[in-house]
Swiss-Prot record:
Catalysis: reaction(s): a D-aminoacyl-tRNA + H2O = a tRNA + a D-alpha-amino acid + H(+); glycyl-tRNA(Ala) + H2O = tRNA(Ala) + glycine + H(+)
The keyword Metal-binding is annotated on this UniProt entry: yes
A single BP term in Gene Ontology: D-amino acid catabolic process
Family according to the record: Belongs to the DtdA deacylase family.
Keyword Zinc belongs to the record: yes
Gene3D superfamilies (alphabetical): AF0625-like
Function: D-aminoacyl-tRNA deacylase with broad substrate specificity. By recycling D-aminoacyl-tRNA to D-amino acids and free tRNA molecules, this enzyme counteracts the toxicity associated with the formation of D-aminoacyl-tRNA entities in vivo.
Name of this chain's protein: D-aminoacyl-tRNA deacylase
The protein's required cofactors: Zn(2+)
Gene (UniProt): dtdA
Cofactor note: Binds 2 Zn(2+) ions per subunit.
Enzyme nomenclature, EC number: 3.1.1.96
Pfam families reported for this sequence: tRNA_deacylase (PF04414)
Amino acid sequence: MKVTVVYYPGDPAAKGAAEALEREYGIKALELPEDPPFFDFNSLAGDAFIVLSRHSSEKRVKAFTVHHTGNFGEAKLGGEPKRLGVAYPSLACSLLRAMNAFRREGYDVTYEATHHGPTSDKPLVFAEIGSVKEDWEDPANHEVLAKAVASWEEHRCEAPKAVWVGGPHYSKRATKRCLEGEACFGHIAPKYALDHLDEDLLRQMVERSFERPERAYVEKKSLKSELRLRVVKALEDLGLEVLVV
């Protein structure tokens, strides 16, 4: 499985990290002609992709983030509505662990929930610098992201593959389990997306993954009893071990 690094030059975080990646590690990232959420990755020759990107946050939280793509509801930023992209759980967790190893003081490292486009049929993971212009343009952040991308295989996650249902957009509980080697996470469905979460989307969370998940974590506090029982049954019917946490 060849993993290709890509970036959009109109994104200062992505451009800076791509330049650092080539300068420091001799890895040349592929330049995209448009912003990644709207790009058709199925047209590229690579097997899987790491997408260098900026991350925006109204709360101005300084962070390095990792997430998969897809839309549980409307397609407000690329992709198709109610369709998920293809996750790559071990790659995402490995990147997160590498980010954690090299992160700067004052910066968080976290999984984000699955969101925005593209809804590609090829596995891809967004690796991001957040969350405002000064962070995106900071050369020290470019160095951290470049080093994490260059060394992700040295931080490879061999833990069971999993999905997560519930909780906030920034999934600290999933992040903790990845960093501790308990599980590598693919798609994460946050609490705000639960109104859209039907059996088809639950199936996509499991089947739209390069590595099929064998486990699911369901946050008890996020789901009312009736919904929780329905979600647990659907995931068990898909063959997953379900942990209510």
